[in-house]
Amino acid sequence: MSNNDYETVVGLEVHAELSTKTKIFCNCSTEFGSAPNTQVCPICMGLPGTLPVLNEKVVEYAVKAGLALNCSISMDSKNDRKNYFYPDLPKSYQISQFDKPLCNNGYIEIEDDNGNPKKVRILRIHIEEDSGKLNHNEFAGGALVDLNRAGVPLIEIVSEPDIRSSGEADRYLKKLKSILQYIEVSDCKMEEGSYRADVNVSVHKPNEPFGKRHEMKNMNSFKSIQRAIDFEIKDQIRANESGETIYRETMRWDDVSGRTFSMRDKEDAEDYRYFPEPDLAAIKLSKEYIDSIKNNLPEMPESRKERYMQELGLSEKDAKALVSEKAISDLFEKAGKICGNYKSVCNWLTSDIARIQNERELPSEKIPFSAENLAELVEIIDNGTISTKIGKDVLEIMFDESKTPKEIIKEHGWIQISDESEIKNVVLEVLANNPQSIEDYKAGKDRALGFLVGQAMKQTK
């Protein structure tokens, strides 16, 4: 039986670390990459007698995200304790939100697999603290706990079960990431774990109830998420067709083998024994506070796309590609403003730069050259200093070396001769040095002309 005989249901719970300078309940730094256990205090270590103080910036960023994602903002919410034991959770509970989250009932607009507009509903957005991190160490004979991440503020964005394929999941996650970056509440660096997703997948036959779902936790690669969803769809259909019982389980995705493995039964809300956090007051928001955040939201991707099409004359395809990532859109705007040739900057970003990024699996935030250098590359091609072909070689070097385009072409002797009199002198010299080739060409040997052209190119290189 094929996939077409079943319907797929995907739900996503996205955890995005907020870009605050300090943690959610204490003044410890949230900077990534510090030595283990150097950004901790009695509060985030969960020591007895300590009391949390809510970081006001966390609430502001969560409300900002909710507004950007078309949510209703709750004027009366609270924190709750989510109780479970794990070595990287020092208090043995996580301060989160249960029945009264900050944001409810939002949506994101994406395209379905046929290119048609589709709304994916967002059930809720709530704030919570991140856990610590286990570093497995063979020399220690186990795992070492690093609590630098404990207490880093998160928003959890929970979708309704509206997604029907791995492709839709991919587009949803990328659109969500883009929006969070545009409003600057999270850097969404997947390689650092600041944007990760719990992925729930189930299958069922049309007009039948949803099937039991498998959950894969803390996934931080778009490619892996798509592969994991596709595997689960096929494996659950196989299990259904062979009469196996599918249980609600938490699964582990293995990138090497390309399959999932069962870890444990899936927990229910009652397993966490939620109860109100007694050490924190309720979160009361005024309409004026919410409106002030709403009125200061930055330009969103859709608005930028329309502006690029109307003011700069870009095609919808190019405008859509540029605004899909804030880093690319910002690079485009800055470089275009410097050199004045927005269309040429667009062509480089959507073709050769995108190709090199894809080949090197390089996030847009890590493009190693500045807008000034990209603008300089466009300018020296526009004024005839180098050809577009040489420009592609210069671009490759710009990804590897911290040099300006002018420094690169000078170093490699790639400056193109554009003076007609100088070119004429070169041609006359080549003709004078190769009389036999001239005679061969006159005799109908076309290859002789290619030889002469090659000699001229060699001298002008």
Residue ranges and their predicted role:
Residues E365-A375, E379, T385-K458:
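Strongly charged, low-complexity linkers/loops
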Residues Y61, A65, Y172-K175, I179-Y182, ...:
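Generic, well-ordered alpha-helical scaffold segments in large soluble proteins
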Residues E302-M309:
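Extended, structured, electrostatic nucleic-acid-contact surfaces
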